């Protein structure tokens, strides 16, 4: 299939549609930056949350069919663990603990590390292209290319989905996934 070059406006619309934003509301490039940041942070949060769930279920021996941890939330031990340990733990440390519990494929670990890196740059900087790792190219790199392009954002979403599906299947089994 031939690659079609999109102009900035067409690419902005395609990115917005890819992440489910009403394109009639986008007014300029800064709006696209906000959409992109929202998508990156959302995917990061989903992965962070499922890593946390794997850790909680391991340490508190909670079966996969128990939802929302209602019984566990009634205990002080669980509340302290979640609020003072898990909530303050960064994603790479959560991944490290999950890897200690059981192996995580290298490709999934690499995806999670890339997602963490790009989320860090976008969430902590108004101009992530000026960070030292991006300054030479002026791009916000994800897997070696600018995540602000439609193709790279597609790869980011596919990668995030791959990581999430692996973690979900590890936790609940593939039969419980709602595709």
Task: Tell me the role of every PLM-derived stretch.
Residues 1-99, 103-117, 121-135, 151-179:
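Amphipathic alpha-helical interface elements
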